[in-house]
Amino acid sequence: MALQALHSSGVGLRRILAHFPEDLSLAFAYGSAVYRQAGPSAHQENPMLDLVFTVDDPVAWHAMNLKKNWSHYSFLKLLGPRIISSIQNNYGAGVYFNPLIRCDGKLIKYGVISTGTLIEDLLNWNNLYIAGRLQKPVKIVSMNENMALRAALDKNLRSAVTTACLMLPESFSEEDLFIEIAGLSYSGDFRMVIGEEKSKVLNIVKPNVGHFRELYESILQKDPQVVYKMHQGQLEIDKSPEGQFTQLMTLPRTLQQQINHIMDPPGRNRDVEETLLQVAQDPDCGDVVRLAISSIVRPSSIRQSTKGLFTAGMKKSVIYSSRKLNKMWKGWMSKAS
């Protein structure tokens, strides 16, 4: 599986993991503390380490974590593990974050998501939230033998390639592809307007082209729709209506439904396949796909950020937001100078 290319045996990450309950189907680290980024993040001292823990039973996991790490939680800890798990699963993007935690000498933020919710997001892009994180290079710290999860991780990467190719011209570079892929989960994200440095996607991709290549190389080589000139770093994609229809038909279900919603006239109620056939012949096919992605990401990012006010608590939310705004301000100043 392509994701295994970035499997990490980092001792430091495993030491952090030892502070938490062991029942994890997947644990991964991401962000500027793991992979170098350009822009303001490049000059950060001791950047916060971002982690995601995937668990089969959120109620049981939070119950154990409350015993081990009571101080990590906001006032919601007083409501117990069932309420915490209900908030995790039923609001926002299905993930519960505890930010600004001091652990093993590092400042960390960790999110908890159920295995079932993650698999659904990877396959269908219901929220394109944690699925979006996993379209970029990550460090896998722990992963069990859940074959459904492994298959979903691989499908998410293949869907990212197909979606990005639909928004690109017939010929493009590896870097063009990776920029489109990295930008999928930021498309429509309101945090790109408030709190995130605008060139974030470029800052992620530019220093990490090799890591993106490692993640996607085998998928690009096997994709029958793609001509991958690996040594030249160039690619070609079939832009015929037939080729685009084939690509559209393999997109995640929620993305297909959003395309149908955008294109379907009021009262018509066409089925999805009929709509995709029309879009495949449309010169603006890529723009329609981009708009559909935004319609998934925007509400998801707003709901998740609103939930963060409660899961993090007001004090941590203010501190965390100020760190984000400070990073954005530094990005503006570096461009102006």
Swiss-Prot record:
Q: Name one GO molecular function term.
A: phosphatidate cytidylyltransferase activity
Q: In which pathway does it act?
A: Phospholipid metabolism; CDP-diacylglycerol biosynthesis; CDP-diacylglycerol from sn-glycerol 3-phosphate: step 3/3
Biological processes per GO annotation: cardiolipin biosynthetic process; CDP-diacylglycerol biosynthetic process
Superkingdom, taxonomy of origin: Eukaryota
Cofactors demanded by this protein: Mg(2+)
Q: GO CC: one term?
A: mitochondrion
State the function annotated in the UniProt record.
Catalyzes the conversion of phosphatidic acid (PA) to CDP-diacylglycerol (CDP-DAG), an essential intermediate in the synthesis of phosphatidylglycerol, cardiolipin and phosphatidylinositol.
**Could you tell me the membrane topology recorded for this protein?**
Peripheral membrane protein
Among the Pfam families in the record, one is Tam41_Mmp37
Keyword Magnesium (UniProt): yes
Name of the molecule in the record: Phosphatidate cytidylyltransferase, mitochondrial
Its annotated compartments are:
Mitochondrion inner membrane
* Alphabetical UniProt keywords: Lipid biosynthesis, Lipid metabolism, Magnesium, Membrane, Mitochondrion, Mitochondrion inner membrane, Nucleotidyltransferase, Phospholipid biosynthesis, Phospholipid metabolism, Transferase
Reactions catalysed according to its record? a 1,2-diacyl-sn-glycero-3-phosphate + CTP + H(+) = a CDP-1,2-diacyl-sn-glycerol + diphosphate
Q: Where is this protein primarily located? A: mitochondrion
Tell me which EC number(s) this protein carries. 2.7.7.41
Q: What class of enzyme is it?
A: transferase
Stated family: Belongs to the TAM41 family.
